[in-house]
UniProtKB/Swiss-Prot annotation:
The lineage of its organism: Bacteria, Pseudomonadati, Pseudomonadota, Gammaproteobacteria, Enterobacterales. One of its GO terms (biological process) is rRNA processing. It comes from Edwardsiella ictaluri (strain 93-146). Phosphate binds at R86, G124, T125, R126. This is Ribonuclease PH. It is an enzyme of class 2 (transferase). Belongs to the RNase PH family. It catalyses: tRNA(n+1) + phosphate = tRNA(n) + a ribonucleoside 5'-diphosphate. Signal peptide: none annotated. Phosphorolytic 3'-5' exoribonuclease that plays an important role in tRNA 3'-end maturation. Removes nucleotide residues following the 3'-CCA terminus of tRNAs; can also add nucleotides to the ends of RNA molecules by using nucleoside diphosphates as substrates, but this may not be physiologically important. Probably plays a role in initiation of 16S rRNA degradation (leading to ribosome degradation) during starvation.
Amino acid sequence: MRPEGRAAGQIRPLRLTRHYTKHAEGSVLVEFGDTKVLCTASVDEGVPRFLKGQGQGWVTAEYGMLPRSTHSRMAREAAKGKQGGRTMEIQRLIARSLRAAVDLKKLGEFTITLDCDVIQADGGTRTASITGACVALADALGALVAAGKLKESPLKGMVAAVSVGIVAGGAVCDLEYVEDSAAETDMNVVMMEDGRMIEVQGTAEGEPFSHEELLTLLALARDGIGQIIQAQKTALEQ
């Protein structure tokens, strides 16, 4: 039995609250059960040096966890003087995922920075960050259009992500912390709304997984992401 009696393919209760802060061009509080992440999208004119003069934009990301977002307090990375490897890996994943959603040529010479700050962690913080950041990105692009700086939104489609894994011998979708810590296989999947995959990160923590189990996990992820993208679209219509 899963926590809260969820079915194998059932995601946690999902909530996307837009315009959560007033300064950023896009801001979303995303909640997957007890995992809560604040995602903001900030627009700056200009692009990194390696893109200057090419007539295209850039999307980048930063990720962090508040000290007491976890069961016991973590020291701030700023206090340590450097980012950890996990943080750098996750923010690169978020940036890669969201760049896939944007026509960078149509964006023009603007840079959009997605900041994902974990307020409370209960598993799936990187997938929640991607899901929330995509909605914040859509709002930021809409703000550029509304300001007359872009003729149309360069968003090619929604992007969302979910974790899947094998827990106690069974494939499940959207793992919370107690499941993630006990998973025999843990996988994060990022997809476009048309079903094309952007990234698949999968690791056997205990017993290696079979080809058939891989296909089962990908099917669970596809169905879960379908539910998430519908929630994103519903939020953007409000």
